[in-house]
Amino acid sequence: MNTSLEQSGCYSNRETLLRCSDARRELELAIGGVLRAEQQIKDNLREVKAQIHSCISRHLECLRSREVWLNEQVDLIYQLKEETLQQQAQQLYWLMGQFNCLIHQLEYTQNKDLANQVSVCLERLGSLALKPEDSTVLLFEADTSALRQTITTFGSLKTIQIPEHLMAHASSSSIGPFLEKRGYIQVPEQKSASSGTAVSLSEWLLVSKPAIGLQAPYVPSTNPQDWLIPKQTSENSQTSARACSFFSDAWGNLKGLENWLLNSHQQEIAGKPSSSKCNSHCSTSSFSPEAEKAEDVELLDQDELDLSDWLVTPQEPCELEKPVDGSWETSEKFKLLFQVFREPYNVSDWLVKPDSCTNCQGNQPRGVEIENLGNLKCLNDHLEAKKSVSVPGATISDGWLAQNHQDTWKVEEVCKANEPCTSFAECVCDDNCEKEAMYKWLLKKGGKDKNGMPMEPKSEPEKHRESLTLWLCPSRNELTEQAKAPKAMAPARIADSFHVIKNSSLSEWLMGPTCKGGPKDVPNTEERAGKEMLQSSMATSWCPFNTADWVLPGKKVGSLSQFPSGEDKWLLRKKAQEAFLNSPLQEERNFRPDCYGLPAVCDLFACMQLKVDKEKWLYRTPLQM
């Protein structure tokens, strides 16, 4: 008994717990629905306010347009009345002039022939209207009470109860169109063009309406076909074709989208049903409801195809499909149609052209305010800048040179205007300051003054060349000093030098092998003694044979032994080694790399102690005797 009681108690507790859980779940769902409804009301509130503002603004604009139209009508009526009264006044003035002439003739003359003229004028006077032919009263009548009533009753707010299963899935922006398609909302007919939403409030309220029988509550359909978009019909296809007719007339028959795909994809899609419309994929600007329905049908037709059919794979090169049915004219037509979108253009053509100054030649003079001088630009500078930008053959190096260009002078130092210009392109002077500064700089570089006359001081390029030469070869300094000295050398001295060379024996020109390739067992003392003896012999017999006398004549240099020979000897050995290693003689006999060539020739030139430029000594033309 106790176990049965315990089981019944547990069962009752479990049932109570389930009921409480269900109740809590229902409350949570209800709270969620209330919160969603509150959010939807907020969204709908903003949308309704925007619609009210737009509608009122448009009708206010209509009232303003009506006001303008009425004013124009008043002006037109005034012009018509004025013309009528002017014509009547002209006739009266003319007739009054006739009577003035007759009165003057009757007073001063006794002519009886005027009776006919008087009778004619009196007849004309009887036929004319002496009162204004047109009325002078112009009134404005308006039914202000009706307008006020229309304004006060303009617009209304309506609400509708939406089913719960639609509230959970429909958003605030899509509730209206969705319910309209399903038949929940009856679209009210527009009463007039000025009041599109002016319908009574009773149509939106849930009140009992007189009917034959009670309307059955709404029951959702269980047939899936009722929830799908209906298939395209012939009527819809004709409607969409009419909507795209103007596009076809302008662009030609572009055919379906499948004609624009690759050949491989078209072969894959060949076995599948394609779109039955020719112009279904054309983008039109039609805002009619028929076009919207056609777009819905297009979406359905596109969904029937597989997604892989629309993807482009990199298996084949992307080439446009050949014209259908081999029609070459159709492809040419497409090229001509889309050629407009491929034409090149220059961005500078769209920019505002700056004004040119009136001082440039070939420009028509025109008035310029002094306040706008800062906005003017010289025509020549503008054309040069435009040419440099629009030249098609400009290379990357030209751009690099333009970026790294450094002006030789500053604008502030050269500009002659009262207020210095920011750049030479904005110069407002008669003569461009940049050109004048360039002219002076070129004259200065050429060693001339501002009048074009040569200047005595050394020009800057010569000074720069001299400093560069001194930095590259310090040994040339002595040669330069010799050149600066007074040039005095007797012809007899040159003749004596040639006489000594002619009478000398050939054995004096040869020397023993003392280079690296020679025997290494010679003591250092003997080598040093041989060099001293050679130098002493050169000091006695070879003194007239001075290399400086052959290159740049100058004063006689003292003993040749005072100059170091390490630099010249090393250079000569290095040149001889490079020349010998590059010659085919080294490959044939396979000499060692440390062999510098003929030892006697190397030591001969090394002992001569050449203290001048070797290139000048080799290439200088001989002296004319």
Swiss-Prot record:
Modification after translation (UniProt): NCOA4 levels may be regulated via HERC2-mediated ubiquitination leading to proteosomal degradation; HERC2 association is dependent on NCOA4 iron occupancy.
GO cellular component: a single term: cytoplasmic vesicle
Keyword tRNA processing: no
GO function terms (MF aspect): transcription coactivator activity
Record key words, sorted: Chromosome, Cytoplasmic vesicle, Lysosome, Nucleus, Receptor, Ubl conjugation
Record has Nucleus as a keyword: yes
Organism the protein comes from: Mus musculus
UniProt-listed InterPro entries: NCoA-4, NCOA4_N
Record-level GO BP terms: intracellular iron ion homeostasis; protein targeting to lysosome; response to hormone
Protein name in the entry: Nuclear receptor coactivator 4
General function of this protein: Cargo receptor for the autophagic turnover of the iron-binding ferritin complex, playing a central role in iron homeostasis. Acts as an adapter for delivery of ferritin to lysosomes and autophagic degradation of ferritin, a process named ferritinophagy. Targets the iron-binding ferritin complex to autolysosomes following starvation or iron depletion. Ensures efficient erythropoiesis, possibly by regulating hemin-induced erythroid differentiation.
Compartments in which it is found: Cytoplasmic vesicle, Autophagosome; Autolysosome; Nucleus; Chromosome
Subunit structure comment from the entry: Interacts with the ferritin complex, an oligomeric structure composed of varying combinations of ferritin heavy chains and ferritin light chains. Interacts (via C-terminus) with ferritin heavy chain FTH1 (via 'Arg-23'); thereby targeting the iron-binding ferritin complex to autolysosomes following starvation or iron depletion. Interacts with ferritin light chain FTL. Interacts (via C-terminus) with ATG8-like proteins GABARAP and GABARAPL1; thereby mediating localization to autophagosomes and ferritinophagy. Interacts with MAP1LC3C/LC3C and GABARAPL2.
Region (Interaction with ferritin heavy chain FTH1): 394-533
Disruption of the gene: reported phenotype: Exhibits profound accumulation of iron in splenic macrophages, which are critical for the reutilization of iron from engulfed red blood cells. Hypersensitive to iron overload. When fed an iron-enriched diet (2 g/kg), mice die prematurely and show signs of liver damage. Ferritin accumulation in the liver, spleen and duodenum, increased levels of transferrin saturation, serum ferritin, and liver hepcidin, and decreased levels of duodenal ferroportin. Defective iron mobilization from ferritin storage, inducing anemia. Impaired ferritinophagy in embryonic fibroblasts.
